[in-house]
Design a protein with these regions (language model features):
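Charge-rich amphipathic alpha-helical interaction elements
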Residues: 1-207
Length: 207
């Protein structure tokens, strides 16, 4: 038998303190869950908006690319594409939301000078290049948001599990334990009162 369940005043204080801490823990978990859910909902809305922008920009980019293919030839467009440098400026940092590490993706802004001569190409190629650069920036942002949303969803699930354990197991346990110890102490006090009353009555009779 757990010594902490013995009906003593010390154990009653411990049980009540544990119950108080469990309630505080549940309130904190519930608050954290609500904050994370709000953050997640905001990210979901943002991801939908960025995805729409990507879809529109992709269509614009491919339309411009098709025109460029017709105007200067597919071979020339491919040759120009080989001059596009590999993206090496991507940096990943993190920030914390209620203890959840969220990625921050940074990169040098697009829109740098083209790697080809203007006189040898057409405006359609410039439009395609600019659109694809915009798609790249949007995709980087979307990847950051989707990864953040995944981490928040996992944290929400974990937080909900802890909150449920406090609400359905820990709090009822210490509520019942406090009641049982208090009832047992009260019963002891009644028995002691009855015993002392009996002793007093016997003394009165003897005198």
């Amino acid at each position: 038998m757990d010594p902490n369940t013995f009906p003593t005043k010390g154990n009653l204080i411990l049980a009540k303190n544990s119950l108080k801490l469990a309630h505080m823990g549940y309130e904190l978990m519930d608050k954290k869950r609500n904050i994370l859910i709000r953050e997640l909902m905001g990210l979901i809305d943002e991801a939908k908006d960025i995805q729409r922008q990507i879809d529109v920009t992709f269509r614009e980019a491919y339309a411009a690319l098709q025109i460029a293919n017709m105007e200067i030839g597919i071979t020339n467009v491919q040759t120009v594409s080989y001059t596009v440098p590999v993206e090496e400026s991507i940096r990943i940092k993190t920030r914390s939301i209620m203890g959840v590490e969220i990625p921050l993706v940074e990169a040098d802004p697009s829109g740098q000078a083209p790697t080809y001569a203007y006189y040898s190409t057409k405006e359609s190629l410039d439009q395609a290049r600019q659109a694809f650069e915009k798609v790249k920036d949007l995709t980087l942002n979307l990847s950051m948001i989707e990864n953040s949303a995944y981490r928040l969803a996992a944290a929400i699930k974990k937080t909900q599990k802890r909150a449920n354990a406090l609400k359905n197991i820990t709090i009822p346990h210490y509520t019942q334990l406090s009641k049982d110890i208090a009832d047992a102490l009260e019963e002891k006090e009644r028995e002691e009162f009855t015993r002392l009353k009996g002793i007093k009555q016997r003394k009165n009779k003897a005198s």
